[in-house]
Amino acid sequence: MNTLEINKDFLDSLFAKAKENPRLRQNYDLRTSAEDQSQRMLNALLPGTEVAIHRHPNSSESVICLCGRMDEVIYEEVVSYLQDGEDTIRKVSYQEIERIHLNPVEGVYACQVPKGAWHTVEVYEPSVIFEAKDGAYGEDGSEAASA
């Protein structure tokens, strides 16, 4: 059995991989196996990374900021209908309703995103977060916002 020590060198290696990644982020899977019934990961995020607005209908999400400075942004889905002749067009948009500024230096370490809440992140400086969700990967009902 190998114990994983999460230290500055480990986080620096995640940041180096994130810099090489076109998405400007890199995760590290902390699960014991792919069959685990929970999701636990570290995610190194660089400024400019774009995480699509998404939600987890079957799970809340715990987010703990180990280092850096970022916002967890919560949205509500707004549905409107437009009449175009005989056609009714359904339009979906997302309105920001809350912003949680995570910054361990300022004493704001974590947040709990409610089950089913639409959310994303805005990263101001290189940050590493620990994320945890219920359910096996791919089985938590995660879905991206429609355009």
Positions of predicted regions on the chain:
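Glycine- and acidic-residue-biased ligand/ion/polar-headgroup-sensing regions
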Residues: 58-80, 84-85
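Conserved short histidine dyad/triad with adjacent acidic residue
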Residues: 42-58, 78, 102-104
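Short histidine-centered beta-strand/loop micro-motifs
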Residues: 30-33, 43, 51-56, 64, ...
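A short, N-terminal "cap"/entry segment at the start of jelly-roll beta-barrel domains
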Residues: 1-38, 52, 85-102
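Short beta-strand His + acidic residue motifs that chelate non-heme Fe in jelly-roll/DSBH
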Residues: 52-54, 72-73, 111-113, 119-124, ...
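Double-stranded beta-helix
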Residues: 6, 14, 79-80, 85-105, ...
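Short, charged/polar surface micro-motifs in flexible loops or helix N-caps
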Residues: 35-38, 46-50, 67-71, 78-79
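A short, compositionally biased micro-patch
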Residues: 46, 56-58, 65, 106, ...
